Amino acid sequence: MKNRGFNTHRHGDGSTVVPPAAEVHLRDTMGELPLLYAAADIAIVGGSLIEIKGIGGHNLLEPCAVATPVLFGRYISDFLEISHNIVERAAGIQVHDSNDLRDTLKKLLNDAALRNRMGANGIQVIKENRGATQRTLELCIPLIESDVLVREH
């Protein structure tokens, strides 16, 4: 990114001061993403762009929850259903290679109205998926109370 003329900052390499002119933030830490997603114009879920053994992607709902359009790659095996929902609802875009990522970023960076629509769509995705734990419990409780799930000793 520096080679392309962007002011960058990498957090997690020991530095604690964020340069005021930083345009691109690379984070390699835990617990900071929700705040950063809320401040961002676009979120790129980088862990989905490359195959990482034992990792099936990263949470695509976090950017949606703060109305930030999300871009992600193909390595999302743990989030297939929600990724399809995000794409269908136009809250995010799955990119297929570096050229696709570049072109999609250019398009979004130059179209604030599109980013705003995608952000609003992301909030809708979150609203539609609330209550998943309750729905899961409603499906599981009858099984637990029946003889279907009996531990054999």
Segments predicted by a language model, with ranges:
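Nucleotide-activated sugar donor-binding and catalytic core shared by glycosyltransferases
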Residues: 1-153
